[in-house]
Amino acid sequence: MLAMEMRSLGASGMQVSRLCFGTLTMGPMQRGFSPERGAALLTYAYARGFRFLDTADIYDTYPHIRLALQKCAYRVSTKAYCWDKATASAALERAFFGLDREYVDVFMLHEQESIHTLRGHREALDYLNEQKAKGRIGLVGVSTHYAGCVRAAAVFGGVDVIHPLINVEGIGIQDGTRADMEAAIAYAHSLGVGIFAMKPLG
C-alpha cells in the first residue's frame, strides 16, 4: 500500500490526503459505473494513498462509496442543493442512509455563487452547523465556481471549508480569471478556512 502526503483542512486539524478523489465521473451522470465497479476503483485508489473523496447528493454515487467504505477508511465530503432547514435535513439524512453511517466528515452547500446566495441559504447553513455541534458532521462548507463567493464565504461565518473551482487555464471560473480565484483562495486560506480544489484539470 502506498502513502500520500496528508494535510490539514485549514485550521480544523482534519487530516486528508493531498489529493481528493472526485466521484462525479463514475456515477450515472457520466460513466455510469455500477456500484461494484465504482467501489473497486475507490479501493484501488485507497491502496495508492487516497484517503479523501468527494461526492454530492445529485451524483448518485453513495452506493459506490458505501461499498468501498466496507474496506477503506476514507474521509467523505458531500454537498447538496439545500436552502432551509427542511431541505438540509432531508439531504443529510439521504447521505446517512446512502452511506450507511450516521456521520459525514464534510457537508457543503452545493454551487454557491455570491454573498447573496449565501444569505439566501443561511437557514440551511445554520442547520448544518447545529448538526456539526451534535457530532453528526465534521466540517461545514460550500462549493463554488466564483472567486467572489470564496471571499464572501471566508468571512460569512459557519464555513469551515471551501471547495473552489481552480485549474491552470481558469476554465469554468464564472466571475474572473485564474489569478482572481488564486487570490481569493489565498485570502480564505489565510483566515484558516480549509480549501480543496475542484476540477484541477479543467
Give, region by region, the residue ranges found by the protein language model.
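N-terminal binding-site loop/beta-alpha segment at the start of enzyme catalytic domains
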Residues: M1-Y74
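Beta/alpha (TIM)-barrel catalytic core signal, keyed to glycine-rich beta->alpha loops juxtaposed to Asp/Glu
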Residues: M6, T61, Q112-G202
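Conserved, mostly hydrophobic/aromatic
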Residues: L9, F21, L53, V76, ...
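Acidic (Asp/Glu)-rich catalytic clusters
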Residues: G10-Q15, I65-A73, E93-E102, A153-G157, ...
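Short, acidic/polar
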Residues: G32-A45, K85-D100, T144-A153
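A structural motif
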Residues: F50, R101-V104, I137, V159
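A short, structured active-site edge motif that brings together acidic residues
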Residues: Y74-A86, F107-Q112
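Active-site groove signature of glycoside hydrolases
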Residues: F96-H116
